[in-house]
């Protein structure tokens, strides 16, 4: 296995955080404008968060499906142009009142109301390629649409709260779906629109030399079509409940650790058929994205396993994962997949060996570096085969950290290390430092480019509510920002065609 990334840079910007008129960022003209911004500043990557459906809590890392796209990102303007919506279908529907934040409660009902109107017209006038789409994706699409149809008929309850005969996919669930064809068609339609709109947007980005870094969560949600339709993939008991769930151990941030609640895979069963489910999942992700950030990479070496009945994550223990043989098997089937290893958190020699032997670039977070020691995260300790960030979606913004939780000692070290100039925002100094680093790739967060505080933080791990809501305001990107980002890119040779090192003659 070998490294694949060139010396370049990009921006982390969730699709949900784009501006736009329909309550949440999506695949409309604002997304195309964002691609144009990246291209004008000579960026090479647009990193996004998972595009899959979200469930309770609105987290893209807790989805009803590992494969289905999020209907919230469907652009209504395209549906108007195609004749499936009229402007009057949208006018008067409440989708939230604050353009800087997503109101998930509002869009849950409002966008569904609008898409229901589109579905009525769609039923009478399906696109010519709709049946081809269904046939090409039936392995995951049909189970997903059945799962969502039954879920809606059961009042949106978690599937283990459904009537007993519906808790596994079979004849009873098939009858429910046969009795409600309009619901089935609705979910097929939204996946069709999602696929076609995303494919066009990605092609537009690729044509401008912008590659998409997608995000692949390691786990699926307990309330997911995978647990319902393919329970054999997981460690479950006779009643269909998880034997154990995922989390993280106690650390300096939490005395009880993090209780994620995701079901644990039956890795032995997966290995017995050559990890075919994962092969399909990675193959699909590579169709959707150009590069994959593989979340919780250390979980493939060893994962924190918590007994299902435990009150918190402190009752868990480490269990060996499939290790390097998993990635070797993928390589045999897929070639060398372009994967970024999210190798943050508790690292052991085993995790480091697995990452290094895989050849995947790891991640460096500058915000973690300033502890008064020769930290692993200080840029002079980086290697080329890494991706450098000031912070990610799980961190405070740079300004929020520096003005808030950073200690005086951390602030002093950060200012000195980054050579912060008089009057220079600390966000610029930190961004400039990762741009100058030896890491092949550096990724800026959009909030840090805009010098925003923690009001723009995307997610605070182990908390509920107030996450995943930030949106960039229309017009926030200025010529000054474009010039600054271009200057960093050119100064530190992060344009792939110009990045080759010239040796002395």
Predicted regions and their residues:
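Catalytic domains of carbohydrate-active enzymes, especially glycoside hydrolases
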Residues: 4, 29-54, 287-289
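Structured C-terminal cap/extension of enzyme domains
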Residues: 451-505
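Alpha-amylase-like alpha-glycosidases and glucanotransferases acting on alpha-linked glucans and related
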Residues: 2-7, 14, 58-195, 220-443, ...
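Conserved, well-ordered alpha-helix/loop/beta-strand core segments that scaffold catalytic motifs
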Residues: 187, 191-220
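Outer-envelope exported proteins of Gram-negative bacteria
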Residues: 49, 211-213, 217, 291, ...
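N-terminal catalytic cores of NTP/NDP-binding nucleotidyl/phosphoryl-transfer enzymes
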Residues: 10, 14-33
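Aromatic/hydrophobic pocket-lining residues that form π-stacking "cages" and hydrophobic walls in ligand
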Residues: 34, 201, 351
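Surface-exposed amphipathic alpha-helices with a cationic face
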Residues: 39, 198-208, 331, 355-356
């Amino acid at each position: 296995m070998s490294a694949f990334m060139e010396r370049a840079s990009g921006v982390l910007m969730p699709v949900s955080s784009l501006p736009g008129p329909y309550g949440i960022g999506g695949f409309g003209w604002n997304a195309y404008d964002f691609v144009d911004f990246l291209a004008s500043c000579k960026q090479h990557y647009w990193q996004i968060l998972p595009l899959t459906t979200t469930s309770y809590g609105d987290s893209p890392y807790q989805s009803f499906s590992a494969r289905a796209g999020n209907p919230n990102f469907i652009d209504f303007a395209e549906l108007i142009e195609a004749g499936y919506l009229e402007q009057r279908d949208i006018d008067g529907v409440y989708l939230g009142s604050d353009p800087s934040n997503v109101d998930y409660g509002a869009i849950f009902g409002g966008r569904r109301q609008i898409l229901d109107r589109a579905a009525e017209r769609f039923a009478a006038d399906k696109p010519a390629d709709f049946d081809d789409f269904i046939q090409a994706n039936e392995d995951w699409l049909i189970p997903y649409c059945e799962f969502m149809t039954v879920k809606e008929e059961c009042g949106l309850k978690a599937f283990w709260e459904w009537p007993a005969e519906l808790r596994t996919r079979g004849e009873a669930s098939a009858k429910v779906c046969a009795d409600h064809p309009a619901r089935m068609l609705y979910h097929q339609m939204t996946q069709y629109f999602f696929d076609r709109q995303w494919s066009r947007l990605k092609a537009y980005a690729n044509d401008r030399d912008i590659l998409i870094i997608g995000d692949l969560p390691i786990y699926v949600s307990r309330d997911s079509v995978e647990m319902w339709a393919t329970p054999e993939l997981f460690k479950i008991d006779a009643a269909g409940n998880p034997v154990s769930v995922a989390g993280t151990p106690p650390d300096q941030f939490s005395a009880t650790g993090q209780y994620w609640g995701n079901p644990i895979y039956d890795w032995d069963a997966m290995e017995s058929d050559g990890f075919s489910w994962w092969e399909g999942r990675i193959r699909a992700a590579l169709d959707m994205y150009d590069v994959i950030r593989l979340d919780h990479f250390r979980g493939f070496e060893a994962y924190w396993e918590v007994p299902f009945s435990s009150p918190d994550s402190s009752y868990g223990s480490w269990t060996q994962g499939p290790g390097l043989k998993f990635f070797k098997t993928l390589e045999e089937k897929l070639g060398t997949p372009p994967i970024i290893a999210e190798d943050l958190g508790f690292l052991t020699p085993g995790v480091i060996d697995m990452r290094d032997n895989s050849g995947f670039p790891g991640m460096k977070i500058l915000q973690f570096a300033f502890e008064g020691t020769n930290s692993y995260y200080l840029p002079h300790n980086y290697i080329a085969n890494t991706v450098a960030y000031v912070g990610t979606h799980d961190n405070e913004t740079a300004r929020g950290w520096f003005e808030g939780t950073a200690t005086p000692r951390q602030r002093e070290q950060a200012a000195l290390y980054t050579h912060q100039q008089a009057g220079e925002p600390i966000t610029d100094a930190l961004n400039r430092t990762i741009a100058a680093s030896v890491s092949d790739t550096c990724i800026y967060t959009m909030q840090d480019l805009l010098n925003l505080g923690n009001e723009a933080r995307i997610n605070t791990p182990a908390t509920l509510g107030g996450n995943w809501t930030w949106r960039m305001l229309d017009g926030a990107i200025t010529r000054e920002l474009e010039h600054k980002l271009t200057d960093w890119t050119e100064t530190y040779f992060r344009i792939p065609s110009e990045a080759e090192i010239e040796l002395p003659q």
